[in-house]
Amino acid sequence: MAQPRIGQTVVVDVPATTANIGPGFDCLGAALDLNNRFTMRRIEGDGERFELIIEGQEGSHLRGGAENLVYRAAQRVWKAAGEEPVALEARVRLAVPPARGLGSSATAIVAGLVGANALVGEPLSKEKLLELAIDIEGHPDNVVPSLLGGLCMTAKAASQRWRVVRCEWMHSVKAVVAIPAIRLSTSEARRAMPKTVPVGDAVVNLGALTLLLQGLRTGNGDLIADGMHDRLHEPYRWRLIKGGQEVRQAALEAGAWGCAISGAGPSILALCSEDKGPGISQAMVRAWESVGVASRAPLLNLQTTGSHWQPWDAG
């Protein structure tokens, strides 16, 4: 494996993700066709030098330096591959807003892993990158679909190995994601949850998850509607999202099969048929507007390819 030359550059596209999807807390996530683009370049300097350039309206909220997730992920690749760290510049075209429940942090982790691995000739397998991504993030539901694409169920087996199952998502099932101009940190959303839950609530979630997965596989809206309910995390998190319940109700009244908090929130996911999408989008935006919150609600498809990289040639 050769050290990347000064100026060597790769471009990494990484999709947004929506995690949990109701009952699949910390194990179910899907990639959406909304990408962050990371252009990673070897620059002059030692391995502790890292420069971050953000293109996008919300870049001021992101940190550079040693705490940056792109940098931390790249460092993990150098170490796992037995390579000396190199100085990096990361230019980010930000389309996935941070602290909205759309896996922005996961895009940074995956980009750092994939980009750093590409710069040294891809010595690490995708399975190893997956392991590193989960270790950095602390839970799998965003980083796994961000890396692999599609709808992914991830669980830790009795052997302590992470096992990933790619689940089917019928192409007729569309996602409206209402993204408000308010932020909610994952740590705050996790603090709102209890340490334990009643056994009955866990049983209800298991049944709901089964219905949801079958509904997504077949495109059966009734099954999606019956399955897209949660008792483990959403009852404690809706109160953190200003106008969240109103937005949810507006989506259902406009024809959504089901509605859930996207990840830790505050974005809200509605699943629907394509013909209902525009009306649901408008209804969700209006509902947030009624409580003084600006938002947008794009109609998105499942992104099935996950992250990918390509070399960049200045010529």
UniProtKB/Swiss-Prot annotation:
Tree of life domain: Bacteria
Molecular function via GO: ATP binding; homoserine kinase activity
Catalytic activity: L-homoserine + ATP = O-phospho-L-homoserine + ADP + H(+)
Xref: Pfam families: GHMP_kinases_C, GHMP_kinases_N
Record localization: Cytoplasm
Pathway where it operates: Amino-acid biosynthesis; L-threonine biosynthesis; L-threonine from L-aspartate: step 4/5
The protein's enzyme class: transferase
EC assignment: 2.7.1.39
Residues bound to ATP: 97-107
Record flagged with keyword Transmembrane: no
CC per GO annotation: cytoplasm
One GO biological process term: threonine biosynthetic process
Keywords: Amino-acid biosynthesis, ATP-binding, Cytoplasm, Kinase, Nucleotide-binding, Threonine biosynthesis, Transferase
Coiled coil segments of this chain: none
Membrane-spanning parts: none
Family assignment from sequence similarity: Belongs to the GHMP kinase family. Homoserine kinase subfamily.
Functional note: Catalyzes the ATP-dependent phosphorylation of L-homoserine to L-homoserine phosphate.
Name this polypeptide is given: Homoserine kinase
Naturally occurring in which organism (per UniProt): Synechococcus sp. (strain WH7803)
